[in-house]
Amino acid sequence: MKLNQAKKFYKKSQNDGLENINPFEIFKKINYELVKALQIVSEKIDKKEIDDVRQKNFTKALTIIYTLQTNLNYEKELKLSTDLFKFYEFCRKKLIEGITSLKSKEILKSAVNLDKIFNFNYIQTNGINDVI
């Protein structure tokens, strides 16, 4: 099979898989990935590890935030979209503030709030309450 045919087949099978998925489930999954990336960056700062994993997850978190912010539907849901934009902007600022000042709690604030909103229960709650 030629490379172009393989790419087309892959893209078609990838798109076919998304047709039956609820858009809210996709939105939740993206936010779950954001929580995980924020958590990893926070842990790496705590361990004082500056490595590819930390950098990759920092970039991943920023990319997810940017993607979420640019795909909000202001025409359909103005207030909700505005509120979500502000919330993701808060997350973005805390991420950048945390990575530049090496303060993991700044990043953890975003992750904990996302975790609570979507009820992921990904982040362990031991000692987290003093973060918020």
Task: Enumerate the language-model features and the residues they cover.
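N-terminal intrinsically disordered, cationic/polar leader segments
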Residues: 1-40, 44-63, 70-72, 79-93, ...
